[in-house]
Amino acid sequence: MPKLKTSKAAAKRFKVTGTGKLKRMKAGKQHILTKKSQKTKRNLRKATMMDPSNEKNMKKILPYL
């Protein structure tokens, strides 16, 4: 059986925590920020965990992460 390929696009966007969960940054912080409040922009700086419903699919495209 051949080696599994890691999705490089996904590997750059996700990190694995010590418990095996996937950590990601929130979207919406790159541009069009003038109409967003300070509170919204502050909350977008925080990392969050991947939703459990997507985690199974992500583990397939990140086999060695």
Curated annotation (Swiss-Prot):
Give the residue ranges for region: Disordered. Answer: 23-44
Cited Pfam families:
Ribosomal_L35p
What are the record keywords, sorted?
A: Ribonucleoprotein, Ribosomal protein
Q: What SUPFAM superfamilies does the entry give? A: L35p-like (SSF143034)
A Gene Ontology term for the protein's cellular component: cytosolic large ribosomal subunit
Q: Molecular function (GO) terms listed?
A: structural constituent of ribosome
> Where does the source fall among the domains of life?
Bacteria
Q: What PROSITE patterns does this protein map onto?
A: RIBOSOMAL_L35
Which GO BP terms, alphabetically?
translation
> Is Ribosomal protein among this UniProt entry's keywords?
yes
**From the record, what ranges are coiled-coil?**
none
Indicate the family of this protein.
Belongs to the bacterial ribosomal protein bL35 family.
The UniProt entry, under HAMAP family, shows:
Ribosomal_bL35
> What protein name applies here?
Large ribosomal subunit protein bL35
Q: Which organism is it from?
A: Lachnoclostridium phytofermentans (strain ATCC 700394 / DSM 18823 / ISDg) (Clostridium phytofermentans)
